[in-house]
């Protein structure tokens, strides 16, 4: 069997171009927002898609995008933050208590280790809020209250941030 390396390279380039166009169209269809992070531009694209889907209650799609951002940048704390919130579906009554903990533990075994991967105070605040949600024992109501209290601290520090 004959192989054509140039053809394979051309096919790979075309796939990349098409994928980029699909991502741009997909991003456009879920709205626009500004959620800057310390992630690489490649990971940021998937992170923003994840946030868009999360805001649109597309939990499965959001989870996929956050995991893609993690594949691109394994220590991208905000991608784990986002995934943490894809396991709670408030409108259909689904609640998975274990997966948010598992998600954050993939980023780091301890809070200190996880926070060391969040390079800005803003990202540390978001990550602390996700930890409050994931690791507070008890009902989903208790977890949401812990998350709300932690987010009030983020708001106090970054009140001009729309997120």
Q: Where in the sequence are the language-model features?
A:
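Alpha-helical tetratricopeptide repeat
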Residues: 40-54, 81, 125-127
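Residue-level recognition of tetratricopeptide repeat
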Residues: 42, 76-77, 160-163
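TPR-adjacent "capping" and linker segments in tetratricopeptide-repeat scaffold/adaptor proteins
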Residues: 31-45, 115-123
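Bacterial N-terminal signal peptides
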Residues: 9-21
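Conserved structural position within tetratricopeptide repeats
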Residues: 68-71, 109, 156
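Inter-helical turn/loop elements of alpha-helical hairpins
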Residues: 57-64, 83-120, 128-142
């Amino acid at each position: 069997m004959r192989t054509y390396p140039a053809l394979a390279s051309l096919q790979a380039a075309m796939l990349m171009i098409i994928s980029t166009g699909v991502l741009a169209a997909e991003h456009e269809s879920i709205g626009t927002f500004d959620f800057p992070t310390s992630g690489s531009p490649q990971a940021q694209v998937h992170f923003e898609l994840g946030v868009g889907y999360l805001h649109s209650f597309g939990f499965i799609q959001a989870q996929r995008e956050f995991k893609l951002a993690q594949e691109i940048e394994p220590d991208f704390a905000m991608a784990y933050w986002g995934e943490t919130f894809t396991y709670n579906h408030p409108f259909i009554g689904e609640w998975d208590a274990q997966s948010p903990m598992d998600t954050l533990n993939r980023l780091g075994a301890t809070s200190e280790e996880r926070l060391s991967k969040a390079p800005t105070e803003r990202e540390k605040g978001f990550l602390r809020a996700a930890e409050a949600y994931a690791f507070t024992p008890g009902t989903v109501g208790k977890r949401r209250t812990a998350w709300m209290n932690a987010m009030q601290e983020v708001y106090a520090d970054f009140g001009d941030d729309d997120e």
